[in-house]
Amino acid sequence: MSQIPFTVSARTAKLIGQENFSNAEGAIIELVKNTYDADSQYCFILFENIGTLNATIYIIDFGCGMNDTTIQNCWMTIGTDDKLFNIKSDNGRIKTGAKGIGRFALNRLGNYTTMYTVPEKSDIGYKWTVDWSYFDKPGITVSDIYASINNIDPKDVKSKIYHLIEEKKIIKEIPPFQNGTVLEITQLNDVWDIEAIKSLSANLEILVPPFNTEEFSIFLYSPFTDLKGKINKSESDDYDYKISSSYKADKDQTLIINITRNELVTSALEQEYKELFKYETMQKYPYT
């Protein structure tokens, strides 16, 4: 009895990824999560030339970067189990990104991607490029599609990052760059108008740690005056119940849940407005 292998069409692999990112906003949020997983303290999202054929999205982090082995064995492997078994980053963060399909978020955003990355303690950087339109060709399997990778000087990546961030003036002092990644997405699939970027900005707030910490900061730049600068954490005191949870990822897989009540306390109202309730009109319905 002979055995034959399964094959996966390139289009099917692409569709699996797209099902997880039904809109462009979700795709960007996924890529921001990846910067957090890379132990970056900063994430920069830059929109350039919006409304033109040269529209570009940049996502920049100062994380651990990737070497050529990681690019080939993890980044280039669809559905990799790396985050399934390595649930914590080197700095102890619980990884939040999708398990092995996050790179398809790039395809959701645009047809062409260039990645510049510098791994930790390395004097070599890497430039990775892919044309996602190849995934739409009929009769093509995943193994028929190639991305290109070349060695680059880390100084060139540093120069590119500083140029992109400095000219936008969204941060007073650019953090020192030793390692990290730049994602450059072109031939965009969506129109990024003011409403789209405003919605993105609002949803990015939930990714900012809720406490007064500089552990992870997100910066956004767009051509719209009110939509540039540091993303602040989402704050709301208008709630009845607030649930917070923390997952320790220990051998017992401990999950801690805290519930805070903020309900209307009628006794406090009666005390605060006790003089009001003494009025004759407040003694009988309809209280007017």
Predicted regions and their residues:
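GHKL (Bergerat-fold) ATPase N-terminal catalytic module, capturing the glycine-rich phosphate-binding loop
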Residues: M1-I185, I194
